[in-house]
Amino acid sequence: MNEHIIQMLPAENLYFLSGMYQWGIEVIKVIQKIENPVLTALVKFVTALGTEALYVPLILFIFWWIDEKRGLRFGILIIVSAWINSFMKDLLKQPRPFNLEPSLGMAFESSYGAPSGHAQMSLCFWIPMAAWLEKVWPRRRTVIWASSIFFVLLIAFTRLYLGVHFPTDLFAGWILGGIVLFILFVPGPSIEKFLASGGFRLQYISAAVITLAMNGIYTRDRSLPAIFLGFCLGYTLMTQRFPFLARAEINGKKPGGKVMFLRCLTGFAGLVFIYLVLRLVFPGEGSLFKETTVWGPASPFYELGRFIRYGLVGFWASAGAPRLFQRMGLASDPGESEK
């Protein structure tokens, strides 16, 4: 075990933590006895499904194609959950298994270990998903819940197999995810009614206040608060000025597969365009002007540019793309129907 890392642990917790870590290392060693190249490749693919690489496309697909309100709920839940996880990681500053036993590392993560973001995010996504799908297909309740729980456990297994999390990291992620669900998902309908009763002004103010609080509490990452603000403001503006209904009829017909494909194509193309173009223009390592002192990675405008970029990404998802769908005839346009 890496003695340098151990010496960094709080003295009063050293005995408990070192014992806990040693137990976790032994568990991982047992799991890694089944290691082989094919299984490792499969595990790395599955573990990638526990990240934004899966959640973002699924949430946007729900928002743009199935149910915009449901997409909003999933989006806010995942954004806030990810922010809380990042905050807790930096607060606890716990090592990963490969920090203590390098031979265990079959993948690399630059962030701290506990609580596991993969465990937390999978719980926060698949449990609400199961609750929703159960209402859509009540006769398939057992299959839906079994599949969701299986996927949560499968994601957790991949983190142990790759040596990037201790079992206790996973437990912490599940506990934190459960708390997030209890605070946001369970009272969700009541929160929505309260915000709706206060009108658009209350919704704008609430989004701004929550964003300020997120930035004030945790200053190391501005991207998640920015996405939250853009996503919420965009949704409020959309419902106020040009209501978008994902399943509304277009010229008397329900949107079909072609419309779905074109919405996803234009929506994701716009998302990538905004992200990449602003990354090239705004300060930072990816900027075209990074060689200049004022616009390089150490630029005083870096955080502001990053906030604007991610804010516009969130705004595009909930307002920009839906409005484009309407203008392209890919969604019903209330403005056109009034003419």
Regions found by a protein language model. Name each.
Residues 1-54, 85-111, 242-243, 250, ...:
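N-terminal transmembrane-helix/juxtamembrane module of multi-pass inner/ER membrane proteins
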Residues 2-6, 68-70, 163, 167:
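Helix-coil boundary and interhelical linker segments in multi-pass alpha-helical membrane proteins
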Residues 12, 31, 72-73, 214-215:
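Residue-level detector of alpha-helix boundaries and kinks
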Residues 20, 39, 54, 68, ...:
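Generic structural signal for well-ordered secondary structure
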Residues 35, 77, 219:
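Charged, low-complexity surface patches
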Residues 42-43, 58-65, 82, 97-265, ...:
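Membrane-embedded catalytic cores of phosphoryl/pyrophosphoryl-handling enzymes
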Residues 50-53, 75, 79, 120, ...:
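Residue-level signal for the membrane-embedded core of alpha-helical transmembrane segments
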Residues 62-95:
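Membrane helical hairpin/interfacial module
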